[in-house]
């Protein structure tokens, strides 16, 4: 069955019953096929086919018809924290709160456990150009897996929990508890070397929740629980500079940070900071999307240090918990639902989790100077 539902004029609701918060969204990594995978705290992996058609113009903007078709659902034994497509094969990897790492092919009804972390498996990344699976867990272990033997080929043990990982080209960045950051040069794997180029403390004072790497692999962004994003540039061939409190850190004249996902509480005349729950980089245009606890998503032009667009999900300010952009750079998926940042006692104030598709108009994909 196909569905076509609009929300806030431009956002399209996928009418599927989701029992608990959506933790992760990933589009299929092909411009020709717009499959969307979701995973979350109801322990279900869901697949949707997303289609769009430009049917006209209104005030110089595209009028778009979007349809969403549920494809498959795969029940897991534990909530899903992360997922990744295995390139364009159609199969996926999932990481769960029980530490399990799983291989899933919904079309062939194949579900195989690949391995295990001693804590929750917070991140799974399939690195296409190296054909490897990377996983990071709350046990502090960063592992590369042999998909045939079900054993890690190599691993690196941190002293801190892994909260987020991101990569592009040869750059892998890891965000850990206590604001510890690390980055790796994946080209070193050809020399059987799997050691971080640098381990250091983030300049952001609050906990880093999400990290994403720029498309060109020349830098990355950190998103924190108190509504702040830091943009960091690096070069593998530049010697790190000693900065702040005796910690080795990367420092570039182009680095900057900014506040976001904050709301003014008029009665108290105070500023309420909300967590940045997820970020993604537009694979075509390089703009960055952040979603947060204030129920808004923002689109950022990092090069021009400016905001391209912002949008609120709904009137009750239900937090946004996950996001991704399709390979063509024009469809934005995001999930709304309680992010539990205020505790269980406030869960009843928010609506049931939902997944939306937003068509990015041309002026919202990139800066005016692109």
Model-flagged regions — what are they?
Residues 1-370:
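WD40-repeat beta-propeller superdomains and closely related acidic/aromatic-rich repeat-like regions
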